[in-house]
Amino acid sequence: EMCIRDSKKMPDIIVEDGVAVRAIKRVYGEVSGDVKHAFEPKDICEIADGKRPGDVEAAKQAFAELGEIAGDAMATAVTLVDGLIVIGGGITAARKYIMPSLLKELRGKMHTITGEELNRVQMKVYDLDNEEEFKEFAKGDQRALKVYGTDRYVAYDPQKRIGVMISKLGASNAISVGAYAFALSQLDAQKQQ
């Protein structure tokens, strides 16, 4: 759980306040100047898409800021944990407004005190929903490595990488699949006792 980590834009505030439903509503209100609006994120996404009247740029910025703050928190998490990032929930309908800033954060740079530039995340970050990036992710940087003392070679892939994707299952299905897999693992564990 990264929810109690500090927020990039508001260091004394928890990150959840920058990535939750209330954040999208708050940022839209602040940027549009309509702080008393009654829009929900679905409405704000429709405004961004031009399907509903409202401030299009404020709507896009609300989702872009969510992506930036989420990307910052995810960059910290993937530094500590090796795994894929799967984003789910209703908010994913606004993917095209969230992902550019989220990926920018994950692919961002940092500097040492002497000015040396480093990647924010040690791994190469791939958008697995992008067909070309998925192919690159799957291919990696495989090369032949000679096994010392033999004539044999093994495949070696030195590329550290991480993938980011939007869940295709939806929250309810993902929970069901996870519960089913857990139940099967528990049954298998009982059989082995």
Indicate where each model-derived feature is located:
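Short, small-residue-biased leader/transition segments that mark boundaries at the very start
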Residues: M2-I4
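ATP-binding/phosphotransfer module of carbohydrate and carboxylate kinases, centering on a glycine-rich
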Residues: K8-Q193
